[in-house]
Amino acid sequence: MKYPTTWLQGASLGERITCELRLQIIRGMQTPGTVLSENQIATDFGTSRSPVREAMKVLSSEGLIRLERMGAVVIGMTPDEMEELFDVRMLIEHFVVQRYVHKDNTILVTTLNQMIDKMEVALKHRDIAEFSLQDFNFHEALVLEAGHTRILHTWNGMRQLILTVMLAATEQRFASNIEESQVTIHKHRTFANALKQGNDQELSRLIEEHYRDTRNAVNDSVLSSYRKT
């Protein structure tokens, strides 16, 4: 699976290369220890080396590769690093939801339910990219609603990594256990209902449950390639 072209509208060539390489690394197509050649990547994408260097800098800042004189060495994401990503996401969602759980969230809940509706349509049509995107949009909407500048800055620093992990995990889930995606939809709907009711304890429980289940799903799919190396 390639990075969805519909997600790349308006992106520079360097950003396109970054997104494709990030997905290859997360999916295990570029395994840890692999040396990425600027010349080969430039040839593969039909471009000069300048956009490739741009992509390498971004991937290095995300900790997915290590820049060396001989080239860029793939690091990937270890199970511990994936755990840390989920830890940060869970902490952020816990915090932001508590900021507005007792307010009138009618508009937000309506928006969340519209995203869930789109997830249901995507599941019906086996549309991996759309399902992943709407799942991501659901969680991002929770963060944006808080209007917390520093948390938003943190989120933006890892949003592409999160989106790519979700895409890779959804691809594996659709292929091996698509029924789990219906469970995901149900849990998102339950979360939206709890937010509508202002049930902060239920929301906290659902967030913890969601990230526990997500960890297990990613360990069974995305990280399996790393355990084999």
Predicted regions and their residues:
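Hydrophobic, amphipathic alpha-helical faces that serve as interaction scaffolds
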Residues: 88-101, 137-176
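Amphipathic alpha-helical dimerization/coiled-coil segments
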Residues: 95-121
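Residue-level recognition of alpha-helical structural elements
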Residues: 81, 105-108, 124-131, 147, ...
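C-terminal all-alpha effector/ligand-binding and dimerization domain
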Residues: 115-116, 125, 167-229
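Residue-level signal for cytosolic alpha-helical hairpin/rod architecture
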Residues: 93-94, 116-117, 135-139, 185-189
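Short linear motifs at protein or domain termini
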Residues: 1-102, 150, 215, 219-229
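Hydrophobic packing residues in well-ordered alpha-helices of helical domains and bundles
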Residues: 85, 112, 131, 135, ...
